[in-house]
């Protein structure tokens, strides 16, 4: 409650609270979630009931309520990057799959390749932060990976046209600033554990076909991670994900060869 009460009101010089420290139970949960092989599910679930884990999620949710686009998530990191004078070669831009990539394959990232993923975000939210988290950093190339949460309707009902418009807007912004664009396919999923009533496979296939065709028309690079991760029926390959949506370390390792083309 103290966090909400301390939230600035109106237009201010610095609307962002101090960075949110990640407590040990959350770090342990993330490590277990990304670990290949059999996972100790009782222990994993017990971590989500740890008071520090619960408090962290509550604080994170409170911040998201006043920062819909997640502009505060990387603001200080961006300021530090710009102040250093180092221009990153590539920005990996996306949702939780991109956010977890930094943990799942840390050797891929560093000063030259940086991650700007935020869990749960739709393409509409990503579009709002595209200038701050991509354009202002002046990278040579940006990889855009979005769509899972649009299909899930994480921020309410939407349409394929809305998704396509958001992708096209980000591409046009990048081109206007001479940033090369890589469009990544939406990874496979037979179901979403947070929206079990949905059958996402057909929409994933349809949107990936559109992404591929749009990339070809616009002279962009299209990276098909779906083909690497998917079974013939469109599910995530067994052993490469705990929840069937987010890759684990083995899943990210399988994506590495394609990811290294983002240069």
Protein language model regions, located:
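N-terminal secretory targeting modules
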Residues: 1-91, 103, 107-108, 137
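Loop/turn elements at helix/coil->beta-strand transitions in domains of secreted/extracellular proteins
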Residues: 87-89, 111-112, 137-142, 175-182, ...
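Second-shell loop/turn segments in exported
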Residues: 115-120, 155-160, 171, 197-200, ...
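Oxyanion-hole/transition-state-stabilizing segment in secreted/luminal serine hydrolases
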Residues: 92-93, 98-116, 124-165, 187-191
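Catalytic His-Asp segment of secreted/periplasmic serine-dependent ester chemistry enzymes
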Residues: 187-263
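Charged, glycine-enriched surface loops/patches
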Residues: 160-184, 210-220
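Extracytoplasmic/secreted proteins, especially bacterial periplasmic and envelope-associated proteins
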Residues: 92, 121, 125, 129, ...
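A generic secondary-structure signal
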Residues: 132-136, 169-173, 258, 262
């Amino acid at each position: 409650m103290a966090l909400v009460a301390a939230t600035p009101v109106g237009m201010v010089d610095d609307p962002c609270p101090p960075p949110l420290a990640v407590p040990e139970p959350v770090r342990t949960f993330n490590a277990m979630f990304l670990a290949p092989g059999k996972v100790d599910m009782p222990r994993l679930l017990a971590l989500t009931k740890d008071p520090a884990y619960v408090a962290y999620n509550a604080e994170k949710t409170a911040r998201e309520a006043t920062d819909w686009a997640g502009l505060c998530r990387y603001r200080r990191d961006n300021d530090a990057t710009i102040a250093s004078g180092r221009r990153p070669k590539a920005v990996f831009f996306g949702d939780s799959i991109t956010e977890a990539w930094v943990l799942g394959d840390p050797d891929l990232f560093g000063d030259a390749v940086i991650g700007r993923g935020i869990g749960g975000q739709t393409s509409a939210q990503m579009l709002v932060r595209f200038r701050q988290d991509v354009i202002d950093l002046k990278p040579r190339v940006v990889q855009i990976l979005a769509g899972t949460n649009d299909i899930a309707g994480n921020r309410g009902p939407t349409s394929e046209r809305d998704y396509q418009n958001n992708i096209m807007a980000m591409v046009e912004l990048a081109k206007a600033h001479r940033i090369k664009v890589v469009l990544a396919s939406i990874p496979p999923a037979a179901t979403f554990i947070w929206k079990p009533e949905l059958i996402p496979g057909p929409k994933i296939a349809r949107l990936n076909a559109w992404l591929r065709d749009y990339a070809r028309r616009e002279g962009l690079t299209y990276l098909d991670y779906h083909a690497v991760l998917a079974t013939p029926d469109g599910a995530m390959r067994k052993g490469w994900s705990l929840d069937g949506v987010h890759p684990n370390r083995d899943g990210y390792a399988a994506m590495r060869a394609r990811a290294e083309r983002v240069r």
